[in-house]
Amino acid sequence: MQIEQLASPGVQRLNAYDPGYDPETIRQMLGLPRMLELGSNENGLGPSASVREVLKQRDFEDAIRYPDAGARKLRQAIAQRWGVDPRAITLGNGSHELLVLLAETFVAPGDEVVFPQYGFAVFKLAAIGSGALPVQVSALPREGAQPFGADPDAMTAALGPRTKLVYLANPNNPTGTWWDRTTLARFLVKVPHSAIVVIDEAYREYVDERQVPDALQLASLHPHVVVTRTFSKAHGLAALRIGYAISNPALAGVLERTRLTFNVNLYAQAAAAAAIADVDHVERVRAANAEQRERLRAGLQKLGLFVFPSQGNFLLADFARPAKPVEDALLKRGVIVRPMGGYGLPTCLRITVGLGHENDELLDALGRVLHEDLA
């Protein structure tokens, strides 16, 4: 018997998540002095000064002790920031862990998990790994205000008696598209209470469009809704791996039964507590991203590319031809972007909105790739 056959049926059907290139590994492989990393939607401004100070003050001798398993100080800080009950908060080793934990906790083999076509890759992986039947719902057409966005009518039609979990990212990664308040509210009313709706708001802090709802406001009206957020993006703490979910306390209590003990380390807890309280820093990050996102959009469009609307810290660009050669040529010039072939978008690349000089460097390299390397 092959070892793989010893795995559960869901795991046997599973492909590992592709996190993209490690910048240092690819730099050494290509023999380049440095790499410009614009493939993972990280925050070039980094964490706030208050977070940096908190981490400087931590004694490394603390590393011999287990962290607070309940992360009470951090949960209280998150609760205070969003006006929720601390018992409604579940912490994860990144929101990725929470998305998987929700499937592991609530889904049984034979249940259906509904998610949009071009939704975050982890949705499908979590569904398959839990032994569920993944129901991938066709997206909106490319022509329209929300190209390749989640189709609310199709998502509603996909709901059935076996639906146990619904995943939706707002704004969506990788398309950058979103549902407005009315669309999301109408959808939530139609979801039976026998199913849990997970709204992933990893990019919430970057939103500057007023019609994009804060899902926490809607979640308070629906006991079967869970909102996930992360400290990896706008808060600049990707390396510390920390995210959180907010739901009704009863649902959060069930998640506590399956959440790994000590899944959030001591340093991540301290940094995140400082980060969530620094509202001014997050606003500076949002404003800087909004400005640079439009600069980058204009530059990409000037190169003749179709650029999807976005409320995140990234842009999806369609090259109208296979994008893999473009990605490879950019790598040789020291620039990392994210290919979208795995999402069924082989003509597209997702590009993180960087700092001003990073965006200038990307546009210069891309122009040379299109007009020289691949001309």
Give residue spans per PLM region.
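PLP-dependent enzyme catalytic core of the Aspartate aminotransferase-like
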Residues: 329-338, 342-375
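PLP-dependent aminotransferase-like
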Residues: 105-168
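N-terminal small-domain helix-loop-helix segment of the aminotransferase-like
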Residues: 2-96, 101, 373-375
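Short acidic capping loops at alpha-helix termini that bridge into adjacent secondary structure
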Residues: 85-89, 109-112, 162, 194, ...
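PLP-dependent aminotransferase class I/II
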Residues: 70, 224-308
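Conserved PLP-binding catalytic core of the aspartate aminotransferase-like
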Residues: 141, 290, 299-333, 349
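Active-site pre-lysine segment of PLP-dependent enzymes
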Residues: 128, 145-161, 174-197, 201-234
